[in-house]
Protein backbone atom coordinates (compact mmCIF):
# COMPACT_ATOMS: atom_id res chain seq x y z
CA UNK A 1 0.00 0.00 0.00
CA UNK A 2 2.82 2.39 0.82
CA UNK A 3 4.32 1.75 -2.63
CA UNK A 4 0.97 2.50 -4.24
CA UNK A 5 0.72 5.69 -2.25
CA UNK A 6 4.23 6.69 -3.40
CA UNK A 7 3.29 6.04 -7.03
CA UNK A 8 0.15 8.08 -6.50
CA UNK A 9 2.20 10.97 -5.11
CA UNK A 10 4.52 10.74 -8.11
CA UNK A 11 1.53 10.98 -10.40
CA UNK A 12 0.18 13.98 -8.53
CA UNK A 13 3.59 15.66 -8.80
CA UNK A 14 3.63 14.96 -12.53
CA UNK A 15 0.19 16.53 -12.89
CA UNK A 16 1.42 19.62 -11.06
CA UNK A 17 4.51 19.71 -13.29
CA UNK A 18 2.36 19.52 -16.42
CA UNK A 19 0.15 22.28 -15.06
CA UNK A 20 3.24 24.44 -14.63
CA UNK A 21 4.29 23.79 -18.22
CA UNK A 22 0.84 24.50 -19.61
CA UNK A 23 0.53 27.74 -17.67
CA UNK A 24 3.87 28.96 -18.99
CA UNK A 25 2.98 27.99 -22.56
CA UNK A 26 -0.35 29.77 -22.25
CA UNK A 27 1.51 32.97 -21.41
CA UNK A 28 3.91 32.34 -24.30
CA UNK A 29 0.98 32.00 -26.68
CA UNK A 30 -0.50 35.26 -25.40
CA UNK A 31 2.83 36.91 -26.21
CA UNK A 32 2.85 35.42 -29.70
CA UNK A 33 -0.72 36.53 -30.34
CA UNK A 34 0.23 40.06 -29.33
CA UNK A 35 3.24 39.91 -31.66
CA UNK A 36 0.95 38.84 -34.48
CA UNK A 37 -1.41 41.70 -33.73
CA UNK A 38 1.51 44.12 -33.93
CA UNK A 39 2.71 42.59 -37.22
CA UNK A 40 -0.75 43.05 -38.74
CA UNK A 41 -0.76 46.65 -37.55
CA UNK A 42 2.69 47.34 -39.00
CA UNK A 43 1.80 45.72 -42.33
CA UNK A 44 -0.55 48.60 -43.08
CA UNK A 45 0.93 51.51 -45.00
CA UNK A 46 -1.10 53.87 -42.84
CA UNK A 47 1.94 53.66 -40.54
CA UNK A 48 5.05 55.79 -40.91
CA UNK A 49 8.60 54.57 -40.47
CA UNK A 50 8.60 56.06 -36.97
CA UNK A 51 5.40 54.20 -36.09
CA UNK A 52 6.94 50.92 -37.19
CA UNK A 53 10.05 51.63 -35.13
CA UNK A 54 7.92 51.96 -32.00
CA UNK A 55 6.03 48.79 -32.88
CA UNK A 56 9.33 46.95 -33.31
CA UNK A 57 10.39 48.15 -29.87
CA UNK A 58 7.41 46.34 -28.34
CA UNK A 59 8.18 43.26 -30.45
CA UNK A 60 11.68 43.25 -28.98
CA UNK A 61 10.34 43.45 -25.44
CA UNK A 62 7.90 40.61 -26.09
CA UNK A 63 10.72 38.51 -27.53
CA UNK A 64 12.78 39.09 -24.39
CA UNK A 65 9.87 37.97 -22.20
CA UNK A 66 9.36 34.88 -24.36
CA UNK A 67 13.00 33.97 -23.75
CA UNK A 68 12.68 34.66 -20.02
CA UNK A 69 9.70 32.33 -19.68
CA UNK A 70 11.61 29.61 -21.51
CA UNK A 71 14.68 29.92 -19.31
CA UNK A 72 12.99 30.58 -15.96
CA UNK A 73 10.08 28.12 -15.88
CA UNK A 74 10.91 25.30 -13.46
CA UNK A 75 9.39 22.73 -11.10
CA UNK A 76 11.21 21.65 -7.96
CA UNK A 77 14.30 23.52 -9.25
CA UNK A 78 14.23 21.58 -12.55
CA UNK A 79 14.13 23.65 -15.77
CA UNK A 80 11.17 22.71 -17.95
CA UNK A 81 11.17 24.84 -21.12
CA UNK A 82 14.84 25.47 -21.91
CA UNK A 83 15.25 22.26 -23.92
CA UNK A 84 16.91 20.21 -21.17
CA UNK A 85 13.77 18.45 -19.92
CA UNK A 86 13.85 15.55 -22.38
CA UNK A 87 12.89 11.89 -22.06
CA UNK A 88 12.20 12.14 -18.33
CA UNK A 89 10.65 9.13 -16.54
CA UNK A 90 7.81 9.43 -14.04
CA UNK A 91 7.37 6.32 -11.84
CA UNK A 92 3.60 5.75 -11.86
CA UNK A 93 3.52 2.12 -10.71
CA UNK A 94 4.96 -0.12 -8.02
CA UNK A 95 6.98 -2.33 -10.34
CA UNK A 96 10.02 -1.85 -12.56
CA UNK A 97 9.54 0.01 -15.85
CA UNK A 98 6.08 1.20 -14.82
CA UNK A 99 7.00 4.69 -15.92
CA UNK A 100 5.56 7.53 -17.92
CA UNK A 101 7.92 9.34 -20.34
CA UNK A 102 7.75 13.11 -20.66
CA UNK A 103 9.87 15.57 -22.66
CA UNK A 104 9.47 19.19 -23.75
CA UNK A 105 11.45 21.01 -26.44
CA UNK A 106 12.76 24.51 -25.86
CA UNK A 107 10.23 27.27 -26.35
CA UNK A 108 12.53 30.27 -26.69
CA UNK A 109 12.51 32.75 -29.58
CA UNK A 110 15.36 30.92 -31.33
CA UNK A 111 13.45 27.62 -31.40
CA UNK A 112 9.92 28.77 -32.19
CA UNK A 113 9.03 29.88 -35.70
CA UNK A 114 8.19 28.42 -39.09
CA UNK A 115 10.08 26.26 -41.57
CA UNK A 116 9.97 28.07 -44.90
CA UNK A 117 11.30 28.17 -48.44
CA UNK A 118 10.65 30.50 -51.38
CA UNK A 119 10.81 30.10 -55.12
CA UNK A 120 14.09 31.34 -56.57
CA UNK A 121 14.16 34.98 -57.66
CA UNK A 122 16.57 36.90 -59.80
CA UNK A 123 18.89 39.55 -58.45
CA UNK A 124 19.17 41.33 -61.80
CA UNK A 125 17.48 41.06 -65.17
CA UNK A 126 16.86 43.09 -68.29
CA UNK A 127 14.37 45.60 -69.66
CA UNK A 128 14.05 47.67 -66.52
CA UNK A 129 13.81 50.96 -68.38
CA UNK A 130 10.82 51.20 -70.65
CA UNK A 131 11.02 54.08 -73.11
CA UNK A 132 7.72 55.88 -73.35
CA UNK A 133 6.06 55.69 -76.72
CA UNK A 134 8.33 52.91 -77.95
CA UNK A 135 6.83 49.83 -79.57
CA UNK A 136 8.26 46.43 -78.76
CA UNK A 137 7.41 42.93 -77.70
CA UNK A 138 6.50 42.19 -74.11
CA UNK A 139 9.50 41.61 -71.90
CA UNK A 140 9.74 38.20 -70.30
CA UNK A 141 8.62 37.58 -66.76
CA UNK A 142 11.40 37.92 -64.21
CA UNK A 143 11.20 34.92 -61.93
CA UNK A 144 12.47 31.39 -61.62
CA UNK A 145 8.85 30.36 -62.16
CA UNK A 146 9.14 31.61 -65.75
CA UNK A 147 9.68 28.06 -66.96
CA UNK A 148 6.16 27.14 -65.91
CA UNK A 149 4.83 29.18 -68.80
CA UNK A 150 5.96 26.35 -71.04
CA UNK A 151 6.77 23.34 -68.85
CA UNK A 152 4.72 21.40 -66.32
CA UNK A 153 6.38 20.56 -63.03
CA UNK A 154 5.96 18.00 -60.26
CA UNK A 155 7.16 18.55 -56.70
CA UNK A 156 7.45 15.77 -54.15
CA UNK A 157 6.74 17.27 -50.73
CA UNK A 158 7.84 15.30 -47.67
CA UNK A 159 6.19 16.86 -44.65
CA UNK A 160 5.46 16.01 -41.04
CA UNK A 161 2.25 14.14 -41.83
CA UNK A 162 3.30 12.33 -44.99
CA UNK A 163 4.62 12.59 -48.54
CA UNK A 164 2.68 13.61 -51.63
CA UNK A 165 3.29 15.13 -55.07
CA UNK A 166 2.10 18.60 -56.12
CA UNK A 167 1.31 18.69 -59.84
CA UNK A 168 1.72 22.06 -61.58
CA UNK A 169 0.45 22.37 -65.14
CA UNK A 170 2.21 24.29 -67.89
CA UNK A 171 1.12 27.91 -68.07
CA UNK A 172 0.82 28.26 -64.30
CA UNK A 173 1.38 31.52 -62.48
CA UNK A 174 2.43 31.82 -58.85
CA UNK A 175 -1.20 31.58 -57.74
CA UNK A 176 -1.60 28.25 -59.54
CA UNK A 177 1.63 26.90 -58.05
CA UNK A 178 0.49 27.79 -54.53
CA UNK A 179 -2.87 26.16 -55.17
CA UNK A 180 -1.19 22.91 -56.21
CA UNK A 181 0.74 22.79 -52.92
CA UNK A 182 -2.31 23.67 -50.83
CA UNK A 183 -4.31 20.85 -52.41
CA UNK A 184 -1.97 18.35 -50.74
CA UNK A 185 -1.40 20.28 -47.49
CA UNK A 186 -3.69 17.90 -45.59
CA UNK A 187 -1.12 15.17 -46.22
CA UNK A 188 2.09 17.18 -46.01
CA UNK A 189 1.28 19.84 -43.42
CA UNK A 190 2.85 22.43 -45.74
CA UNK A 191 0.94 25.59 -46.65
CA UNK A 192 1.70 27.74 -49.71
CA UNK A 193 1.23 31.45 -50.26
CA UNK A 194 1.70 33.42 -53.47
CA UNK A 195 2.30 37.14 -53.84
CA UNK A 196 3.53 39.31 -56.70
CA UNK A 197 5.50 42.48 -55.99
CA UNK A 198 6.76 45.20 -58.28
CA UNK A 199 8.08 48.71 -57.94
CA UNK A 200 7.72 51.82 -60.07
CA UNK A 201 10.64 54.21 -59.78
CA UNK A 202 13.16 56.36 -61.62
CA UNK A 203 10.59 58.52 -63.39
CA UNK A 204 12.78 61.09 -65.11
CA UNK A 205 10.31 63.90 -65.67
CA UNK A 206 6.92 65.33 -64.77
CA UNK A 207 4.48 64.30 -67.46
CA UNK A 208 1.13 62.71 -68.25
CA UNK A 209 1.53 58.95 -68.24
CA UNK A 210 -0.65 56.15 -69.50
CA UNK A 211 -0.24 52.38 -69.32
CA UNK A 212 -2.31 49.25 -68.98
CA UNK A 213 -2.29 47.20 -65.81
CA UNK A 214 -3.51 43.64 -65.49
CA UNK A 215 -3.70 41.34 -62.49
CA UNK A 216 -6.52 39.00 -61.58
CA UNK A 217 -8.80 40.19 -64.38
CA UNK A 218 -8.40 38.79 -67.89
CA UNK A 219 -8.93 42.32 -69.20
CA UNK A 220 -6.30 45.01 -68.71
CA UNK A 221 -7.25 48.28 -67.03
CA UNK A 222 -5.92 51.61 -68.25
CA UNK A 223 -4.09 53.86 -65.81
CA UNK A 224 -3.80 57.57 -66.58
CA UNK A 225 -2.01 60.03 -64.32
CA UNK A 226 -0.49 63.47 -64.58
CA UNK A 227 2.59 63.72 -62.39
CA UNK A 228 3.41 67.25 -61.30
CA UNK A 229 6.66 66.30 -59.58
CA UNK A 230 8.81 63.18 -59.76
CA UNK A 231 9.56 63.55 -56.06
CA UNK A 232 5.92 62.83 -55.17
CA UNK A 233 4.02 60.14 -57.08
CA UNK A 234 0.74 60.45 -55.18
CA UNK A 235 -1.24 61.07 -58.39
CA UNK A 236 0.08 57.87 -59.97
CA UNK A 237 -0.52 55.86 -56.80
CA UNK A 238 -4.13 57.05 -56.65
CA UNK A 239 -4.66 56.25 -60.33
CA UNK A 240 -3.40 52.68 -59.85
CA UNK A 241 -5.57 52.16 -56.77
CA UNK A 242 -8.61 53.43 -58.66
CA UNK A 243 -8.53 50.22 -60.76
CA UNK A 244 -7.47 47.86 -57.96
CA UNK A 245 -10.99 46.43 -57.81
CA UNK A 246 -10.40 44.90 -61.24
CA UNK A 247 -6.68 44.15 -60.99
CA UNK A 248 -6.31 43.20 -57.34
CA UNK A 249 -3.12 45.28 -57.42
CA UNK A 250 -2.63 47.86 -54.68
CA UNK A 251 -0.14 50.71 -54.74
CA UNK A 252 1.67 52.39 -51.85
CA UNK A 253 4.22 55.17 -51.87
CA UNK A 254 7.78 54.49 -50.78
CA UNK A 255 9.18 56.41 -47.81
CA UNK A 256 10.67 59.11 -50.06
CA UNK A 257 7.40 59.42 -52.06
CA UNK A 258 9.40 59.03 -55.31
CA UNK A 259 8.53 55.38 -55.86
CA UNK A 260 5.50 53.12 -55.72
CA UNK A 261 5.33 49.57 -54.39
CA UNK A 262 2.82 47.35 -56.18
CA UNK A 263 1.40 44.21 -54.56
CA UNK A 264 -0.88 41.51 -55.97
CA UNK A 265 -1.62 39.45 -52.87
CA UNK A 266 -3.19 36.51 -54.71
CA UNK A 267 -0.13 35.75 -56.84
CA UNK A 268 -1.52 36.74 -60.23
CA UNK A 269 1.07 38.08 -62.67
CA UNK A 270 1.44 41.85 -62.73
CA UNK A 271 1.38 42.77 -66.42
CA UNK A 272 2.28 46.32 -67.39
CA UNK A 273 1.83 47.27 -71.03
CA UNK A 274 1.45 50.00 -73.62
CA UNK A 275 3.42 52.55 -71.64
CA UNK A 276 3.17 56.02 -73.15
CA UNK A 277 3.77 59.60 -72.10
CA UNK A 278 3.06 62.99 -73.59
CA UNK A 279 6.83 63.46 -73.91
CA UNK A 280 8.11 60.38 -75.77
CA UNK A 281 11.67 60.54 -74.44
CA UNK A 282 10.59 60.36 -70.82
CA UNK A 283 11.48 57.04 -69.18
CA UNK A 284 10.18 55.16 -66.18
CA UNK A 285 11.54 52.03 -64.53
CA UNK A 286 9.45 49.10 -63.43
CA UNK A 287 11.24 46.56 -61.29
CA UNK A 288 10.42 43.72 -58.96
CA UNK A 289 12.21 44.85 -55.80
CA UNK A 290 9.50 45.98 -53.44
CA UNK A 291 11.01 47.04 -50.99
CA UNK A 292 14.49 45.48 -50.54
CA UNK A 293 14.39 42.16 -48.69
CA UNK A 294 15.67 38.65 -49.19
CA UNK A 295 12.29 37.54 -50.49
CA UNK A 296 11.29 40.72 -52.27
CA UNK A 297 12.02 39.64 -55.84
CA UNK A 298 14.32 40.82 -58.57
CA UNK A 299 15.65 44.26 -59.31
CA UNK A 300 15.57 44.94 -63.02
CA UNK A 301 18.58 46.88 -64.25
CA UNK A 302 19.49 47.80 -67.79
CA UNK A 303 23.27 47.64 -67.51
CA UNK A 304 24.11 44.49 -65.58
CA UNK A 305 27.39 42.65 -66.10
CA UNK A 306 27.43 39.70 -68.46
CA UNK A 307 29.29 37.50 -65.97
CA UNK A 308 31.74 35.79 -68.35
CA UNK A 309 35.51 35.72 -67.81
CA UNK A 310 38.63 35.31 -69.93
CA UNK A 311 39.17 31.63 -70.68
CA UNK A 312 35.51 30.62 -70.51
CA UNK A 313 34.38 28.25 -73.26
CA UNK A 314 31.01 29.12 -74.79
CA UNK A 315 28.75 27.62 -77.42
CA UNK A 316 27.36 30.24 -79.79
CA UNK A 317 23.89 29.87 -81.32
CA UNK A 318 22.06 32.43 -83.44
CA UNK A 319 19.44 32.80 -86.13
CA UNK A 320 21.39 35.77 -87.50
CA UNK A 321 25.04 35.11 -86.72
CA UNK A 322 27.44 37.96 -86.08
CA UNK A 323 30.09 38.28 -88.79
CA UNK A 324 33.03 36.02 -87.98
CA UNK A 325 31.00 33.66 -85.77
CA UNK A 326 29.23 30.44 -86.76
CA UNK A 327 26.13 29.18 -85.04
CA UNK A 328 26.47 25.97 -82.94
CA UNK A 329 30.27 26.42 -82.72
CA UNK A 330 32.43 26.71 -79.59
CA UNK A 331 34.59 29.74 -78.79
CA UNK A 332 36.92 30.92 -76.05
CA UNK A 333 36.50 34.27 -74.31
CA UNK A 334 39.73 36.06 -75.22
CA UNK A 335 39.18 39.36 -73.43
CA UNK A 336 36.48 41.26 -71.57
CA UNK A 337 36.36 44.88 -72.66
CA UNK A 338 33.47 45.92 -70.44
CA UNK A 339 30.54 44.58 -68.51
CA UNK A 340 28.53 44.33 -71.73
CA UNK A 341 31.21 43.63 -74.35
CA UNK A 342 33.77 40.87 -74.80
CA UNK A 343 35.97 39.28 -77.47
CA UNK A 344 35.56 35.69 -78.65
CA UNK A 345 38.52 33.78 -80.10
CA UNK A 346 37.71 31.67 -83.18
CA UNK A 347 39.32 28.33 -84.06
CA UNK A 348 41.70 30.03 -86.49
CA UNK A 349 42.90 32.46 -83.84
CA UNK A 350 40.88 35.46 -84.99
CA UNK A 351 39.22 37.69 -82.38
CA UNK A 352 35.61 38.77 -82.85
CA UNK A 353 34.11 41.53 -80.70
CA UNK A 354 30.75 40.57 -79.27
CA UNK A 355 28.27 42.51 -77.14
CA UNK A 356 27.12 46.09 -77.02
CA UNK A 357 26.37 47.11 -80.59
CA UNK A 358 27.91 43.88 -81.89
CA UNK A 359 25.40 41.61 -80.18
CA UNK A 360 22.11 40.29 -81.41
CA UNK A 361 19.03 39.88 -79.27
CA UNK A 362 18.41 36.47 -80.85
CA UNK A 363 21.83 35.14 -79.85
CA UNK A 364 22.55 32.48 -77.29
CA UNK A 365 25.90 31.94 -75.57
CA UNK A 366 26.08 28.81 -73.47
CA UNK A 367 28.95 28.52 -71.02
CA UNK A 368 30.07 24.89 -71.01
CA UNK A 369 33.17 24.82 -68.80
CA UNK A 370 31.37 24.75 -65.45
CA UNK A 371 28.61 22.74 -63.85
CA UNK A 372 26.35 25.79 -63.74
CA UNK A 373 25.66 26.40 -67.42
CA UNK A 374 25.21 30.02 -68.43
CA UNK A 375 22.77 30.70 -71.23
CA UNK A 376 22.03 33.89 -73.12
CA UNK A 377 18.52 34.22 -74.50
CA UNK A 378 16.65 36.87 -76.43
CA UNK A 379 14.23 37.23 -73.51
CA UNK A 380 16.96 38.98 -71.52
CA UNK A 381 18.81 41.55 -73.60
CA UNK A 382 21.06 42.76 -70.80
CA UNK A 383 21.33 41.35 -67.35
CA UNK A 384 22.59 38.71 -64.96
CA UNK A 385 20.50 36.24 -62.99
CA UNK A 386 21.18 35.80 -59.30
CA UNK A 387 22.05 32.11 -59.55
CA UNK A 388 24.64 32.83 -62.25
CA UNK A 389 22.85 30.67 -64.80
CA UNK A 390 21.94 33.22 -67.47
CA UNK A 391 23.77 36.16 -69.00
CA UNK A 392 22.91 38.33 -71.99
CA UNK A 393 25.19 40.23 -74.31
CA UNK A 394 22.79 41.72 -76.83
CA UNK A 395 21.96 45.41 -77.03
CA UNK A 396 19.27 46.81 -74.77
CA UNK A 397 15.78 46.99 -76.19
CA UNK A 398 13.02 49.56 -75.79
CA UNK A 399 10.19 47.21 -74.90
CA UNK A 400 7.21 49.04 -73.47
CA UNK A 401 5.70 46.12 -71.57
CA UNK A 402 6.60 43.48 -69.04
CA UNK A 403 5.08 40.63 -67.07
CA UNK A 404 6.21 40.12 -63.49
CA UNK A 405 5.65 36.68 -62.02
CA UNK A 406 5.04 36.32 -58.31
CA UNK A 407 6.88 34.35 -55.69
CA UNK A 408 5.60 31.26 -53.90
CA UNK A 409 6.40 30.74 -50.22
CA UNK A 410 5.99 27.37 -48.49
CA UNK A 411 5.60 27.19 -44.73
CA UNK A 412 5.07 24.65 -41.96
CA UNK A 413 5.70 24.48 -38.22
CA UNK A 414 7.53 21.21 -38.91
CA UNK A 415 10.58 20.54 -41.09
CA UNK A 416 9.90 19.50 -44.70
CA UNK A 417 11.64 18.96 -48.03
CA UNK A 418 10.72 19.58 -51.67
CA UNK A 419 12.16 17.48 -54.49
CA UNK A 420 11.66 18.08 -58.22
CA UNK A 421 9.80 15.34 -60.02
CA UNK A 422 11.35 16.45 -63.31
CA UNK A 423 14.42 18.37 -64.44
CA UNK A 424 13.56 21.71 -62.83
CA UNK A 425 13.28 22.79 -59.24
CA UNK A 426 12.01 26.33 -58.99
CA UNK A 427 12.76 26.42 -55.27
CA UNK A 428 16.48 25.96 -55.90
CA UNK A 429 19.04 26.93 -58.52
CA UNK A 430 19.73 23.23 -59.12
CA UNK A 431 17.64 20.08 -59.35
CA UNK A 432 18.45 18.94 -55.83
CA UNK A 433 16.10 18.34 -52.94
CA UNK A 434 15.56 21.51 -50.92
CA UNK A 435 15.18 21.46 -47.13
CA UNK A 436 13.12 24.20 -45.54
CA UNK A 437 14.98 26.46 -43.12
CA UNK A 438 13.69 27.63 -39.76
CA UNK A 439 12.71 31.29 -39.63
CA UNK A 440 12.98 32.17 -35.95
CA UNK A 441 10.36 34.28 -34.25
CA UNK A 442 13.26 36.03 -32.53
CA UNK A 443 14.33 37.45 -35.90
CA UNK A 444 10.95 39.02 -36.67
CA UNK A 445 11.39 42.58 -37.92
CA UNK A 446 8.25 44.63 -38.55
CA UNK A 447 10.06 47.92 -39.22
CA UNK A 448 9.00 47.70 -42.89
CA UNK A 449 5.76 46.75 -44.60
CA UNK A 450 7.32 43.71 -46.25
CA UNK A 451 9.01 42.62 -43.03
CA UNK A 452 5.71 42.83 -41.17
CA UNK A 453 3.96 40.79 -43.85
CA UNK A 454 6.65 38.11 -43.78
CA UNK A 455 6.50 38.03 -39.98
CA UNK A 456 2.94 36.73 -40.01
CA UNK A 457 3.79 33.24 -41.27
CA UNK A 458 6.73 33.00 -38.86
CA UNK A 459 4.59 33.93 -35.87
CA UNK A 460 1.84 31.58 -37.05
CA UNK A 461 4.40 28.78 -37.11
CA UNK A 462 5.48 29.62 -33.56
CA UNK A 463 1.87 29.59 -32.39
CA UNK A 464 1.36 26.21 -34.06
CA UNK A 465 4.47 24.85 -32.33
CA UNK A 466 3.27 25.90 -28.88
CA UNK A 467 -0.25 24.65 -29.64
CA UNK A 468 1.14 21.25 -30.53
CA UNK A 469 3.11 21.07 -27.27
CA UNK A 470 0.04 22.08 -25.28
CA UNK A 471 -1.98 19.44 -27.10
CA UNK A 472 0.60 16.77 -26.26
CA UNK A 473 0.82 17.69 -22.59
CA UNK A 474 -2.96 17.95 -22.43
CA UNK A 475 -3.16 14.34 -23.56
CA UNK A 476 -0.49 13.44 -21.02
CA UNK A 477 -2.47 15.23 -18.31
CA UNK A 478 -5.59 13.22 -19.14
CA UNK A 479 -3.64 9.99 -19.05
CA UNK A 480 -2.04 10.83 -15.70
CA UNK A 481 -5.40 11.77 -14.21
CA UNK A 482 -6.68 8.35 -15.21
CA UNK A 483 -3.55 6.80 -13.71
CA UNK A 484 -4.05 8.71 -10.46
CA UNK A 485 -7.69 7.60 -10.22
CA UNK A 486 -6.72 4.01 -10.89
CA UNK A 487 -3.94 4.06 -8.27
CA UNK A 488 -6.33 5.55 -5.75
CA UNK A 489 -8.91 2.88 -6.50
CA UNK A 490 -6.34 0.09 -6.16
CA UNK A 491 -5.03 1.55 -2.91
CA UNK A 492 -8.52 1.83 -1.40
CA UNK A 493 -9.46 -1.71 -2.33
CA UNK A 494 -6.20 -3.20 -1.10
CA UNK A 495 -6.59 -1.29 2.15
CA UNK A 496 -10.13 -2.61 2.46
CA UNK A 497 -8.92 -6.14 1.79
CA UNK A 498 -6.18 -5.81 4.38
CA UNK A 499 -8.69 -4.54 6.92
CA UNK A 500 -10.91 -7.56 6.31
CA UNK A 501 -7.99 -9.92 6.78
CA UNK A 502 -6.93 -8.15 9.95
CA UNK A 503 -10.50 -8.31 11.32
CA UNK A 504 -10.68 -12.02 10.58
CA UNK A 505 -7.36 -12.66 12.26
CA UNK A 506 -8.46 -10.70 15.31
CA UNK A 507 -11.74 -12.65 15.56
CA UNK A 508 -9.91 -15.93 15.48
Language model regions located:
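Autoprocessing Asn-cyclization modules and mimics
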Residues: 283-329, 334-345
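Basic helix-extension-helix modules of the SAP/HeH family
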Residues: 317, 355, 360-362
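Primary detection of the long, small/polar-rich alpha-helical "axial" segments characteristic
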Residues: 1-290, 296-299, 311, 348-349, ...
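Histidine-centered active-site/metal-ligand motif
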Residues: 306, 363-366
Amino acid sequence: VSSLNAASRNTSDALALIGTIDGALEESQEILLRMRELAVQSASDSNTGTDRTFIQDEINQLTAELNRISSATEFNSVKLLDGTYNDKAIQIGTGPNQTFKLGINATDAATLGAYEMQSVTEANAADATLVMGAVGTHASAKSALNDLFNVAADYVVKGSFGTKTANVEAGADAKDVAKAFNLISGTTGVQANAVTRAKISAITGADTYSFTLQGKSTTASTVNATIASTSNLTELKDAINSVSGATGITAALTEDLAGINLVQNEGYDIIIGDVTAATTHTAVSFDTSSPPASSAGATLTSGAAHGLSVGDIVKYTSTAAVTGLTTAKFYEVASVASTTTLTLKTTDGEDVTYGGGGGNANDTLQKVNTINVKTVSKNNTTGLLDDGSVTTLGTATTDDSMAIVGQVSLSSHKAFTVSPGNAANHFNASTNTVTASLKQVGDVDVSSQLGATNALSVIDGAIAMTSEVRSDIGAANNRLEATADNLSNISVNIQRSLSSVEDANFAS
